[in-house]
């Protein structure tokens, strides 16, 4: 153990930049940090997109201007050949609606459907043939409210 972790052995970081709160030259991503977000693979993927831009600024001695918004999305198997899809971030809880994914088409949010189950199965191919080789994903790093039932967001 590095001794950088908190009582849960997670590195305390700025949730927007993943920069350590104690060591300015350390960044912790994914399962290693204490951000208030899911430990889903999508979170690590979106964090890394933001981190790369910030790290290039950091090593050039510039201010880090990119911010991770806590974006997470994942399929949840619900049984009987159906799955739900959720999409959320630090500020917005999962909302019902449609998830517009370029080239894939609309998928239902917070609703068990066969299409979502098939999307989850297709993601295995996307993982190995798009994500692992480092090809860009057709999903924005920052959460979009497009297609979501924003009328359900309560005023804070």
Where are the predicted features?
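Short C-terminal domain-edge/linker segments immediately following a structured domain
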Residues: 16-23, 57-62, 105-110, 118-119
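A generic structural micro-environment signature
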Residues: 5, 10, 17-19, 49, ...
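Noncatalytic linker/hinge segments flanking ATPase motor cores
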Residues: 6, 11, 25-35, 66-75, ...
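FAD-site-proximal beta/loop scaffold in flavoenzymes
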Residues: 1-49, 56-57
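Active-site-proximal substrate-binding core of FAD-dependent oxidoreductases
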Residues: 34, 56-103
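A broadly tuned preference for mixed-charge, low-complexity surface segments
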Residues: 29-46, 78-88, 128-142
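Residue-identity detector for glycine
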Residues: 3-5, 30, 41, 61, ...
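C-terminal auxiliary extensions adjacent to catalytic cores
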Residues: 85-156
């Amino acid at each position: 153990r590095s001794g950088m972790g908190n009582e849960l052995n997670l590195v305390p970081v700025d949730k927007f930049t993943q920069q350590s709160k104690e060591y300015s030259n350390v960044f912790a991503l994914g399962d290693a940090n204490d951000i208030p977000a899911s430990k889903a693979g999508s979170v690590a993927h979106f964090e890394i997109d933001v981190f790369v831009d910030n790290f290039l600024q950091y090593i050039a001695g510039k201010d880090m201007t990119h911010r991770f918004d806590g974006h997470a999305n994942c399929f949840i198997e619900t049984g009987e050949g159906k799955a739900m899809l959720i999409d959320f971030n630090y500020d917005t809880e999962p909302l019902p609606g449609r998830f517009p994914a370029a080239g894939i088409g609309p998928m239902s949010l917070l609703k068990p459907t066969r299409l979502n189950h098939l999307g989850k199965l297709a993601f295995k191919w996307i993982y190995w043939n798009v994500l692992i080789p480092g090809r860009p994903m057709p999903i924005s790093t920052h959460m979009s409210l497009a297609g979501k039932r924003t009328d359900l967001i309560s005023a804070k």
